[in-house]
């Protein structure tokens, strides 16, 4: 027997140890049986999604239109549930406030695994128009719970909701039992940082003491036809000179 010294370590025949784990079961991700079970399990889940409706604002009106006979979302196997313990999908539609945040997190934690989240509407995703000057609006529901599908719009149409459900079904169809522990909700948490621009408070509680209450702006007095007070005229000229200088 002649030994070939040119063979590398990878080309040499590996010695089989009868005590160790069999090679055929070391990597079960490509196993035919588990692949079939995955497909069957995923098909059953994506064909019978039970959503928990968490509507807080006008976006929920569009979802209510989706329940009607015109769009008929029952064809996707969606059955709305009133209890989070019987739901595997939560659809947040509308503005989420700081006072409402603990209740939303509690509902999400009561849902059994696997569970999914659809963020519906601009107010849910980024805070929307309420994120400008509202101190109580949450700037994105992904700061509270992980989101699987983002559905932008103000509000999104029922056709867009159907498209989001189809995308979620495709995502469920690609799940694997071997990877399920690695893509749990806690491991795919996503959050965005929002750069808030500080502005002076509008409501200071000193409206009765404001200067404009006693001395209206010059433009307003000229538009109404009232004579401009000398003190106001003097202050306006002083401000203009300060800006020029």
Curated annotation (Swiss-Prot):
The function of this protein is: NDH-1 shuttles electrons from an unknown electron donor, via FMN and iron-sulfur (Fe-S) centers, to quinones in the respiratory and/or the photosynthetic chain. The immediate electron acceptor for the enzyme in this species is believed to be plastoquinone. Couples the redox reaction to proton translocation, and thus conserves the redox energy in a proton gradient. Cyanobacterial NDH-1 also plays a role in inorganic carbon-concentration.
The family annotation for this protein states:
Belongs to the complex I 20 kDa subunit family.
At the top level, the lineage of the source is Bacteria
Q: Which organism is it from?
A: Nostoc sp. (strain PCC 7120 / SAG 25.82 / UTEX 2576)
Q: Where is the protein localized?
A: Cellular thylakoid membrane
User: InterPro entries, per this entry?
Assistant: NADH_UbQ_OxRdtase-like_20kDa (IPR006137), NADH_UQ_OxRdtase_20Kd_su (IPR006138)
Binding-site positions, [4Fe-4S] cluster: 58-59, 123, 154
Q: Provide the catalytic activity annotation.
A: a plastoquinone + NADH + (n+1) H(+)(in) = a plastoquinol + NAD(+) + n H(+)(out); a plastoquinone + NADPH + (n+1) H(+)(in) = a plastoquinol + NADP(+) + n H(+)(out)
GO MF annotation list: 4 iron, 4 sulfur cluster binding; iron ion binding; NADH dehydrogenase (ubiquinone) activity; quinone binding
**A GO BP annotation:** photosynthesis, light reaction
- Protein name per UniProt: NAD(P)H-quinone oxidoreductase subunit K
Going by the UniProt record, its keywords in alphabetical order are: 4Fe-4S, Iron, Iron-sulfur, Membrane, Metal-binding, NAD, NADP, Plastoquinone, Quinone, Thylakoid, Translocase, Transport
What is its cofactor?
Answer: [4Fe-4S] cluster
Which Enzyme Commission numbers does its entry carry? 7.1.1.-
Oligomeric and partner information: NDH-1 can be composed of about 15 different subunits; different subcomplexes with different compositions have been identified which probably have different functions.
Topology in the lipid bilayer: Peripheral membrane protein
GO cellular component terms attached to this protein's record: plasma membrane-derived thylakoid membrane; respiratory chain complex I
Enzyme group, top EC level?
translocase
| Entry's cofactor comment | Binds 1 [4Fe-4S] cluster.
Any S-S bridges, and between which cysteines?
none
